Amino acid sequence: TSRRQRQMCIRDRHGIRDVNGDPLNWEACITMNNNWGYCARDKFFKPSSMIIKKLVECVSKGGNMLLNVGPDAYGNIPPESLQILSEIGAWMKKNSKSVYGCGMAGIEKPDYGRVTRNGNLLYYHMFENTMGPVPLTGIKPGTIKKIRLLCDGSEVPISDSWVHTDYPDIVFANLGPDPVLPDAVDTVLEVELTE
């Protein structure tokens, strides 16, 4: 609240902005466990799935993520950290295109995950599966050139099921009958727009 106008409350729901209302660069700094640097007693490491989802969240909000890795006095990185970094690296090997060079998509966050964007490419990050076809909210029908799974490049068809006729303004991607996502941490759909 303001000192002069106690009834006034200032909120930052629209992100961090400068005096002109333009978004500012920002960064989230996180640790792999609960301490900065090395702490032999701290064995409470964050799972790689949590770190991947936080990375995607930062990018989808227009930010950067710094990940702290604390080597010991001899320069050795703890085995727990190496395992987590290896798992993050395996996910990035398949999905880095949805992170590097991307930023906010200007689309409301879907219930199942996040959305990042790079030019005419939208990346729908699915942290959990939907019941049936995936609603690609924020995209106008007729503006999609192609949808594919980023992890393997396989094309994903647009659903034309009769159950979607009540939602003419939403495009639905059909991942098929298997309710299990290809990647339990974050399955990424790359949506190429015509413009």
Which residues make up each language-model segment?
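Single conserved hydrophobic/aromatic residue that forms the stacking wall/gate
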Residues: 1-10
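Carbohydrate-binding surfaces of carbohydrate-active enzymes
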Residues: 11-195
